[in-house]
Amino acid sequence: MRDAETQGLVLYSRNYKEKDKLVKIFTESFGKRMFFVKNFGKSPYASSLQAFTDGKLTATINDGGFSFIEDVSEVVVYKNISSDIFINAHASYIISLADAAISDNQYDPGLYGFLKRSLELLDQGFDMEVVTNIFELQVLHRFGISLNFSECAFCHKTVGPFDFSYKFSGCLCPQHFDEDLRRSHLDPNVIYLVNLFQEISLDELKKISIKADMKLKIRQFIDGLYDEYVGIHLKSKKFLDGMSGWADIMK
């Protein structure tokens, strides 16, 4: 065990025994850790340890079991994520993806910062689907997946249009479409936007407008990539998918 200070982003909590809780926090300095909080309801830090909060932790870090919180300060609460069910669903999904992408205790300040910035953009009102798509695509390499959407897999031509081939795990230009008769037959704009999303920095992201039908095409393509190459099935993703028809009902 060692005492330390670190920034931490609360991923989730769950009940443990009668009055205690386990709180999973993605720390900047020590990766994802499970913290034991005794008598959670009476803890002075209870409000600071809700999901979608970020703060400075003073803690005892234990590599072989539960860690323990000594103090929480400089707390940031993502209020819009907490209050809007649609934003909340997207945030819950990307948090689940981050949790699945690396092992517990694995030091990864890059992913911590990427997740934090993604949540900030969601909370600020940036397009939920766009932020989520960017996160999904850029976290793929944490699962060991590296896909190139910027050039043809055969001739390396960098000017589209392109289609995607699961057979070759890459793009095809029109001159090489015949190499895979079962290619995806995508709208060329899907590959263009997916390549943009894979390369863009969140700090450079501006307000952009994408039509609903194009968002659906991108969604279906990314789902296909995850089914083919990653193979995880998250409850938060299933819930998010089930919300597709809610918007009109709740108007």
Curated annotation (Swiss-Prot):
The name this protein goes by in its record: DNA repair protein RecO
InterPro entries xrefs: ARFGAP/RecO, DNA_rep/recomb_RecO_N, NA-bd_OB-fold, RecO, RecO_C
Stored Pfam families: RecO_C (PF02565), RecO_N (PF11967)
Coiled-coil residue windows: none
This protein's UniProt keywords: DNA damage, DNA recombination, DNA repair
Disulfide bonds: none
GO biological process, one term: double-strand break repair
Family: Belongs to the RecO family.
Reported function: Involved in DNA repair and RecF pathway recombination.
Entries under NCBIfam families matching the protein: reco
Cross-referenced SUPFAM superfamilies: ArfGap/RecO-like zinc finger, Nucleic acid-binding proteins
GO CC terms in record: bacterial nucleoid
Originating species: Lactococcus lactis subsp. lactis (strain IL1403)
Top-level lineage group: Bacteria
